[in-house]
A protein has these predicted regions:
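Short, conserved secondary-structure transition motifs
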Residues: 119-131
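Conserved "landmark" site that anchors the functional core of diverse proteins
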Residues: 134
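Basic, often amphipathic N-terminal segments
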Residues: 10-120, 137-170
């Protein structure tokens, strides 16, 4: 399945969790091949809320599979472009949304290379098998150009992140 990423698929989604944190995620359109595959894998589309029948595997109990996909089923099939952050007091949500929209519109369409299953911090993820310059450039753009909106991490948050032993790329 080919994934074509372009700015026309951009749609901001705000989650009202307290304390407010914001992040930038790429979520495939619910009716795209990627969106349909993700909804089936997780058993639910986070964008539409529509439930889906999860696949059955001979090597894993269906209740166990349903259980281990419960957290991702809630937040959905996505790719993180900028990790969650708290908004600095100098900016309002509207400023952030405007900047996100401008950045998304500046993206040129690109295809992802083949993906492989990987484990990252205890999570299963799909990662490119080879370096994708446009993907890295898009993610770097969101991280770099939205950093002025992010409140610096406090000591406890820094300690938690350091304990996670993130890779240099992360």
């Amino acid at each position: 399945v080919k994934c074509r990423i372009n700015s026309s698929t951009y749609r901001p989604v705000i989650s009202a969790q307290l304390p407010f944190r914001y992040a930038v995620y790429f979520c495939p359109a619910p009716d795209s091949n990627w969106g349909l595959a993700g909804a089936q894998w997780l058993g639910r589309c986070a964008i539409t809320g529509k439930k889906d029948t999860q696949p059955q595997f001979s090597d894993i109990d269906s209740e166990l599979f349903h259980s281990i996909t419960s957290d991702p089923r809630r937040y959905g099939w996505h790719a993180t472009l900028k990790a969650p952050f708290k908004l600095v007091p100098e900016h309002e949500v509207g400023d952030l949304l405007l900047k996100m929209h401008q950045l998304a519109k500046s993206l040129k369409p690109f295809d992802l290379p083949k993906l492989e299953v990987s484990t990252t911090g205890g999570f299963l993820s799909l990662r490119p098998r080879e370096v994708s310059t446009p993907l890295h450039a898009a993610a770097a753009m969101f991280v770099r150009d939205l950093q002025s909106f992010a409140l610096p991490l406090n000591d406890a948050e820094l300690a938690r992140r350091r304990k996670a032993k993130l890779t240099l790329e992360q």
